């Protein structure tokens, strides 16, 4: 049997061509709508959110970019009010754990020897502090609590200390006199008191930043008392710009800026002695205590800003560098190129000078 062939008329062919053309056009439109919807879901329009408040005796300032609350509700993301509640919860937990200003904090109970059981927040701070102490040859030390308290930089009233008093308290100072066994803190001396203030705000900054990232908020900057972490870039592609304060003559002087730095996925923490000090017999005493002597540091380094991958480390190193002084801190940086720093110091002639590590040449600009 032969094969049958069906030939269409010209009119019928024209009709079919129009149908196929319309079908292809409709399919193209549907594909565009589909991908447009997917794109809008994956890359929604971002809105700027700002949060300000008080914690640990200082301020916090947070800026982040996220979808609108309407979009978040539709896509089962955390809304801005839920994000705020989450951050508040973090701040409360940290305050209840390591704050010296909170009489009921777990740290105060440990310092008073009411307990030696540490929670997760205390353990994380202890281990971070221990790491920085080892890294800096003991120039960072959390066991200075009793001395800092006696010098008048903590929550209690100050009294003038004699050399004998300082020497006696130094017996209980030394990070090696503390150790962690499971969840318990073991003190060599019960008189030893812990002070996490030199990393607490950096730790808080990191915890807030990590919380935002867990909630798909990757474009943000967190500042807790000057301890800053900048995540990602702004929606316009610009890096975050952070100001570095010019050291002032006294703690009440109006703030002026020395320079600005551009940051992306890094932290910057500044430590200085020009706003936190006490005066005794006409002499200005720094709030930074040398853990090897028990006395306030005395050198020409006015402030140091440390750039690191996380705020906890940057916070601890900034304190350690203020103890070391400029020259020893620079020696440390020569062997640890993963960290950068900006030094503001006074010369013998009384002039204020600035220096920085070479890696910052392209992202650091002098203030006008």
Where are the model-predicted features located?
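Mature catalytic core of soluble alpha/beta enzymes
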Residues: 11-25, 35-368
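Hydrophobic helical h-region of N-terminal Sec-dependent signal peptides
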Residues: 28-32
């Amino acid at each position: 049997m032969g094969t049958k062939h069906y030939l269409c008329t010209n009119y019928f062919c024209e009709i079919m061509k129009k149908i196929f053309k319309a079908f292809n056009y409709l399919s193209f439109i549907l594909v565009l709508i589909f991908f447009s919807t997917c794109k809008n879901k994956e890359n929604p329009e971002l809105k700027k959110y700002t949060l300000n408040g008080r914690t640990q005796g200082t301020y916090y300032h947070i800026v982040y970019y996220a979808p609108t609350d309407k979009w978040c509700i539709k896509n089962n993301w955390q809304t801005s009010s839920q994000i705020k509640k989450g951050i508040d919860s973090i701040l409360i937990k940290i305050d209840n754990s390591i704050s010296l200003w909170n009489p009921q904090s777990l740290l105060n109970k440990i310092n008073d020897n009411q307990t030696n059981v540490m929670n997760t927040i205390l353990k994380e701070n202890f281990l971070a502090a221990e790491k920085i102490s080892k890294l800096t040859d003991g120039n960072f030390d959390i066991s200075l609590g009793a001395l800092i308290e006696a010098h008048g930089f903590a929550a209690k009233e100050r009294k003038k200390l004699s050399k004998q008093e300082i020497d006696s308290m130094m017996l209980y100072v030394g990070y090696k006199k503390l150790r962690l066994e499971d969840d318990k803190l073991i003190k060599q001396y019960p008189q030893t008191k812990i002070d996490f203030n030199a990393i607490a705000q950096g730790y808080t900054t990191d915890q807030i930043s990590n919380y935002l990232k867990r909630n798909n908020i990757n474009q943000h900057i967190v500042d807790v008392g000057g301890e800053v972490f900048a995540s990602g870039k702004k929606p316009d592609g610009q890096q975050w710009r952070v100001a570095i304060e010019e050291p002032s003559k006294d703690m009440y002087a109006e703030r002026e800026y020395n320079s600005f730095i551009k940051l992306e996925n890094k932290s910057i923490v500044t430590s200085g002695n020009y706003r936190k000090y006490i005066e005794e017999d006409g002499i200005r005493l720094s709030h930074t205590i040398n853990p090897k002597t028990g006395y306030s540091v005395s050198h020409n380094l006015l402030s140091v800003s440390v750039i690191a991958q996380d705020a906890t480390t940057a916070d601890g190193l900034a304190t350690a560098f203020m103890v070391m002084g400029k020259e020893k801190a620079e020696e440390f940086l020569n062997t640890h190129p993963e960290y950068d720093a900006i030094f503001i110091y006074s010369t013998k002639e009384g002039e204020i000078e600035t220096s920085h590590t070479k890696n910052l040449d392209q992202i650091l600009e002098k203030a006008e």
